[in-house]
Every structure is written in structure tokens, then in C-alpha cells.
Regions:
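Catalytic alpha/large subunits of respiratory electron-transfer oxidoreductases
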Residues: 1-282
């Protein structure tokens, strides 16, 4: 019976914990489970068993997003709702093919593209959305950081920066500004394989939009430049004031349907529910 099965599981866990310690046990939860199930799983492992050995694909597949956004914004969660697409004047899609991987969100993005919203796609592959995009930056694989540095360069040198937002809400901007100002666009053009004039147009479109909304996927995060790319995407949003409002922000497209929820609920060894740092007693 189920009652007998639960008794066996409980007895075995207690026996292992008593013999080898709580850290000899680990739990793996699922990003296809509900928020409630994920919360209970991490709570059981942390409270009943007494260890932080709880994990899932939320940390593995989108660790660069979580870490990069944590460094930039203090949280690794998406900043906006998919419904905010209705308010966006520009959409920036980087390293993702949501028509295939996230069909509901992909359909909403496609509808926005077809309605004429200014659209920028960065992808080595010519996807259906890339065909529809206003600007397709078809980079060489491995040049994610380079293409974003080019965009940042043009936003800075062409005076498209949101000075009020930077002065009010950011730190160390001048260091970043000095770095991107000194970049050689001819060299980066050769590296990325994308015309610097096309990059300049895309940068202007993103920076001058009233509300520009960014989405990125596993083409960014499952990559050796993942965290740096996410931090540069964050920098672009901050330097143009495209954060903290409806219709803007950074919005990772995760690998499974509830990766965001699993992370929110604390299914990761280094953070509890609500992204609480386990190393901080408060």
C-alpha cells in the first residue's frame, strides 16, 4: 500500500541520515512540477532531512542567467510578464527560437513582429522569427559578447544613453563607458561577421524605443560566455532605461515549463525560496 511505501521511504532516509549524516542525502526536483510541489520538496530536504542538497535543472540550464542577473539586478528572475509584449515598442530576441521551444510565448512574439513592432534578432541561424525581424544580426557562433559590445559602443558614442536612469539607479557606469568607447568596430565587425552599420541601426532601434523588451534563451546560457552575455544584456537595458517598467526588461526563456517557478521556490543548493542566500543567517 501507499502507507507502507511511505513508511519504507521514511525509515530508509532516517537510517541513512543517522549512519552517514544529513549531507549524504540529496534531492532532485523537477522544473515540470508545480510551484507547490517544488516548494514542498526543497522544504522536506532542508527541514526534515537537514541538508541544502536540493537541486534541479533550474540551476543547471540557466545558471548563467541567474548569476548574471543577480549581479546586475539583485535577482535572477525574469523582470516582466509575457503579457507586457502588448506594451513593447521594440523586441530584442537573443539566442532563442521560441516558436519551436516556447510556442505560446513564441506565438505572441510572432504576432508582435507581424504587427510591425521594431524587432531585433541575434542568432547564427535564420529562424522564422529572424526572417520576420526588422534587423537580423546573424553572428558567427561564439561572438555573443562581441556583438553586444558593438551595440553598447554605438549607444554610448551616439549619445543614446538614458542619463537620468544611470545617475539614479546604477553604479560604475563610467568604467563600462570607457571600455566600450575604446573598442575597434572594424575588428569586431570581422569577428562577428555582421556589418557594423547594421549593428548600429539595431542599437539605435533598441535605445530609442519608448519600451524595448528583451528575451534570451539557451543560445545564450548554455555557452561558455553565458554569464558575461547576460550581464551585457543587463547593461544595455540599464543604460537605455529599459528596466523597471511595463513592456521592457530582461526575460529569459527557460528550458522547461516551470524553471522559473522551481528557482523561485528554492530548488537550488545555494538559495532558498525567494532567492534567500543560505549563507546569510537573516
Amino acid at each position: 500500500t501507499w502507507d507502507e511505501a511511505y513508511d519504507v521511504i521514511t525509515e530508509k532516509l532516517i537510517d541513512i541520515r543517522n549512519k552517514y549524516g544529513a549531507d549524504s542525502i540529496g534531492g532532485i526536483s523537477s522544473s515540470r512540477a508545480t510551484n507547490e510541489e517544488n516548494y514542498l520538496m526543497q522544504k522536506m530536504i532542508r527541514v526534515a532531512v537537514g541538508t541544502n542538497n536540493i537541486d534541479g535543472c533550474a540551476r543547471v540550464c540557466h545558471a548563467p542567467t541567474a548569476w548574471g542577473m543577480q549581479q546586475s539586478f539583485g535577482t535572477g528572475a525574469a523582470t516582466n510578464s509575457v503579457e507586457d509584449l502588448k506594451q513593447a515598442d521594440a523586441i530584442f530576441l537573443f539566442g532563442a527560437n521560441p516558436i519551436k521551444g516556447h510556442p505560446v510565448t513564441g506565438a505572441k512574439i510572432k504576432q508582435a513582429f507581424m504587427k510591425g513592432v521594431t524587432s531585433i534578432v541575434v542568432d547564427p541561424v535564420k529562424t522564422k522569427l529572424a526572417d520576420l525581424a526588422t534587423y537580423h544580426l546573424q553572428i558567427r557562433p561564439g561572438t555573443n559578447v562581441a556583438i553586444l559590445n558593438m551595440m553598447a559602443h554605438y549607444i554610448v558614442t551616439d549619445n543614446l544613453v538614458n542619463e537620468y536612469f544611470i545617475e539614479s539607479y546604477t553604479e560604475k557606469y563610467n568604467e563600462f563607458k570607457n571600455h566600450v568607447e575604446g573598442l575597434n568596430m572594424d575588428e569586431l565587425e570581422k569577428l562577428t561577421g555582421v556589418s557594423k552599420e547594421l549593428v548600429k541601426k539595431a542599437a539605435h532601434a533598441y535605445a530609442t524605443a519608448e519600451r524595448a523588451m528583451e528575451f534570451h534563451g539557451l543560445g545564450v546560457t548554455e555557452h561558455f560566455q553565458g554569464s558575461k552575455t547576460v550581464m551585457l544584456l543587463s547593461n544595455l537595458a540599464m543604460m537605455t532605461g529599459n528596466i523597471g517598467r511595463n513592456g521592457v526588461g530582461l526575460n529569459p526563456l527557460r528550458g522547461q515549463n516551470n524553471v522559473q517557478g522551481a528557482a523561485d521556490m528554492g530548488v537550488q543548493p545555494h538559495q532558498g525560496a525567494g532567492y534567500l542566500d543560505i549563507n546569510k543567517p537573516e
